[in-house]
Regions:
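Hydrophobic alpha-helical transmembrane segments
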Residues: 32-47, 119-125
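Membrane-water interface of alpha-helical transmembrane segments
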Residues: 21, 28-31, 56-59, 63, ...
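Interfacial segments of alpha-helical transmembrane regions
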Residues: 38, 42-78, 149-153
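C-terminal TM-helix exit segments that contain a strictly Trp-centered aromatic cap at the helix terminus
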Residues: 37, 72-85, 163-166
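Membrane-interface interhelical connector segments
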Residues: 82-108
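Membrane-embedded catalytic cores of phosphoryl/pyrophosphoryl-handling enzymes
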Residues: 99-176
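N-terminal transmembrane-helix/juxtamembrane module of multi-pass inner/ER membrane proteins
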Residues: 1-41
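Transmembrane helix-loop junctions in multipass membrane proteins, especially transporters and channels
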Residues: 50, 54, 80-88, 169
Length: 176
């Protein structure tokens, strides 16, 4: 794979993040957020727009997912990069502990799909689509009927950015 190139470029900054903020409660909260809030966000986004009877935004949300996955799959297949916790010595796979609520997810992960991070790409794509949509309508975000949902998506992106470093999952270059 290409993990040694990424590690050579980034060094052990993600290890520093993990060691600097290590906390059991934070680990549990971020593990839950990384898996379940993310799943809620990606499943709920198109459904939210459908329930609001905004078919245009529902279509755009699904198109966002399709494009992001079309871009990501070749990287997963041909540019294998291990997750940070399986490559950096001393880095713990915090999320991959034995817990009843994480067992299914942690047992099926091959730990070799470190680039790109869909946890950042999908919600960031939604934000971009939202901004482009309100621009095309000629309105401000404060006037848009989905502004609260947009704020929810925007608030989760920094949490994902920190979580993927802290939990020992992704490299910094995954999100650039």
């Amino acid at each position: 794979g290409f993990t040694h190139y990424v590690h050579g470029f980034e060094g052990e900054l993600t290890l520093w993040v993990q060691q600097s903020f290590r906390n059991e409660i934070l680990s549990d909260v971020l593990s839950f957020h990384y898996l379940f809030v993310y799943l809620f966000l990606i499943w709920f986004s198109p459904i939210y727009y459908i329930l609001c009877r905004d078919e245009v935004m529902a279509d755009k949300a699904v198109l966002n997912y399709s494009i992001i996955y079309l871009l990501a799959v070749p990287l997963y297949l041909f540019f294998n990069v291990e997750v940070t916790s399986s490559f950096i010595p001393g880095m713990d796979a915090i999320m991959y502990h034995e817990s009843w609520n994480l067992f299914f997810f942690t047992e099926v992960d091959p730990l070799d799909n470190g680039i790109p991070s869909l946890h950042v790409g999908l919600p960031l794509g939604l934000l971009i689509i939202n901004r482009l949509h309100i621009r095309s309508l000629g309105i401000k975000m404060a006037e848009w009927r989905h502004r609260e949902f947009d704020l929810f998506v925007a608030a989760n992106i920094p949490i994902y950015l920190f979580s993927i470093q802290y939990l020992g999952i992704h490299w910094i270059s995954d999100v650039i």
